Amino acid sequence: MDSKVVIYTDGACAGNPGPGGWGALLQFNDTSKEIFGYELDTTNNRMEITAALEALRILKKSCNVEIYTDSKYLQQGITAWIHNWIKNNWCKSNNEPVKNADLWQKLYAELSKHTIIWKWVKGHANNSGNIAADKLAVQGRETAIEILKCRG
C-alpha cells in the first residue's frame, strides 16, 4: 500500500433539504481527478458524506489516503461517533436512529479497503483543494437546480 492519495471533498445544498451537489478532488503524484454529482432532494450533510464515499469508491486499489473536509459532521462522524453508532445498532445515545445511517454504513464499508487519515480544514479559507472541491459541489448543485427547472 505505497500509493498515497490526497482527497478534498465538499457538499453543497440549495435549501436544507433541497437540490444538492457533491464534489471531490483526488490527487495522486502529479495527477488530479475531479468528480461531482447531484441529488434533486437532499441535505448538506448527505452531500458531504456522499462526496467522501464516491471519492473512495473510485480508487481501484488499496491506498494510503488523506481526506480533507470542511465538514465537522463528516470528520467527527467517521472518526469518533461511528464506533458507538455501530455498538448501538445505528442508534444515538438517546435511542434515536442515526441520521443518514444508510450513507454512514456504505462509507464505513469503504474504510477497510484503505488506510485513511481524516483531516478537517476551514471552509472558504484559501485552501486550493477545498476551493476546488467546493466548486465541484456547487456545479453538482447547479445541475440539480437546472434539472428541476426543466421539470417545471
Curated annotation (Swiss-Prot):
It is found in: Cytoplasm. It comes from the Bacteria. Binds 1 Mg(2+) ion per subunit. May bind a second metal ion at a regulatory site, or after substrate binding. GO terms for molecular function: magnesium ion binding; nucleic acid binding; RNA-DNA hybrid ribonuclease activity. Keywords: Cytoplasm, Endonuclease, Hydrolase, Magnesium, Metal-binding, Nuclease. Its main location: cytoplasm. One of its GO terms (cellular component) is cytoplasm. PROSITE patterns: RNASE_H_1 (PS50879). Its EC number is 3.1.26.4. GO terms for biological process: DNA replication, removal of RNA primer. It catalyses: Endonucleolytic cleavage to 5'-phosphomonoester. Mg(2+) 2 binds at D10, D134. Its cofactor is Mg(2+). Signal peptide: none annotated. Monomer. This is Ribonuclease H. It comes from Rickettsia felis (strain ATCC VR-1525 / URRWXCal2).
